[in-house]
């Protein structure tokens, strides 16, 4: 508050690496900042005094204050049971965000770096998900041969739906990573209505611009005919800056 930064903006800055010198993982540090923001001025004052004892870990300090019934500088319980229950009601909302973002820590870091800086300096998008799937970058896709299988994660630059002359609907998707672009097409055919199936599974909504998606498909000249699309946006909480 003294710096004139609300907790949402501070949370996004931390997730983007503004306090990277700390050894704590970013999503955990975000939760600590959000928890500290919920404290009263009296609690904050005492927590700062207790900092060296608990290595300035806000969550561990809260745990000790409640379990060990630590007294404040006014010789009263620093955080009584009733006060802790009040604190916990608001804290649990932030804990849910942490539970989500810590599972995909690298993805959360990549997203907020790109959102606030325009690029990610700590990781490549391919490396975020490469442990799950055999991914390619856009350069490798471009260098691949016709009919090669393609597996790629990227950011949607544009996506729109059209209908072919024979009446089948299709979606054109332009996506990119740090190295270049990929043009893909998700089509309905007589054999399989791939676009229709995707829409049915995603509330009749195409991938939005700036969404992060994973595609599987087959290379054909300068385009990839897509077999399946997965939207990765729901893996992390993306609206930290909107928090109050």
Predicted segments, located by residue:
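Single-stranded nucleic-acid-binding OB-fold domains
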Residues: 23-24, 121-237
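Sliding clamp-binding short linear motifs
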Residues: 1-145, 170, 223-243
